[in-house]
Amino acid sequence: TIAVTFAIVSLATAGVLLAGCGSKEKKTEVTVFAAKSLNGVMDELCEKYNSEHPNVTFQTNYDSSGTLMTQIKEGAKCNIFFSAGVSQMDELQAGFDGGDIVEGSRRDLLNNQVCLVTWKGSDTKVTDFSNLSLAKNMALADQTVPVGQYTRKALINAGMAGSEYTEVDQLTDDVISKALGGLEINNCANVGAVASAVAEGANEVGTVYYSDTFGYEDQLDIIEQLPNSLTGDVIYPVAAVESDNTSDEELEASEDFLTYLQSEEAVKLFEKYHFTVQ
């Protein structure tokens, strides 16, 4: 009798434990593809959101917006795309094989500004963007990278690229070098690589976003913040991405995180990193 009673109690206890396991909330992983210039602030935002929503975890991928866009179009798993350029988001929103931007999820969330920088203590003769040719060399993001595109647009609008060049994609490194009196160009894969190259003294000057100077205060000097009349508006759009493999839970978590990115807490963090919220 004792053995039978023990068996019944044991089974009952096991049932309670199994029921408890079954009721535990399932974790949902959200994959975020974000421009390299968002690395610091997005790490903080994901961590804060996770502390309030422990059932949601994040997988982050930071690179140039052009590279990220290509990866998404080639089928890489992505739930949220946060671009440093409008054109990359526009291209995805036009449609791509196997996925789409979730209708109504896009927000043109942030503004930034392009800065011409040099390393702390350099003896550069460059005093503003117009006399960039006085530098010996320059770190410049590739044509596929938004900050590289904004810089090339500024060269065109300032009349520094030559009258025959009117489109950003015409300004190869060789064309820019020739237009600026033989300035040596170090082509960089993303804006983070530009900031590092200048901060380390490998290049005399470079163009980065104002937000990229955060954390580099002891290593970089800002020569000039380029006006929007030269670069155009530097807008960061963000949107949810879906494919045939996107679960309802991922979609729901992604849309809630997008709402969080517009919260007062998120706005304060963006501003801490020198972004302006639209």
Q: What residue ranges belong to the model's regions?
A:
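Residue-level detector of structured alpha->beta connecting loops
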Residues: 76-77, 202
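Short glycine-biased active-site loop of nucleotidyltransferases that positions the nucleotide triphosphate
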Residues: 72-74, 107
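Short, well-ordered coil loops that connect the C-terminus of an alpha-helix to the N-terminus
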Residues: 55-56, 78
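Acidic, polar ligand-binding/catalytic clefts
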Residues: 87-102, 107
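Ligand-binding clamshell of periplasmic/extracellular solute-binding protein-like
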Residues: 62-70, 77-93
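Short, low-complexity disordered leader/linker segments with a strong preference
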Residues: 1-29, 277-278
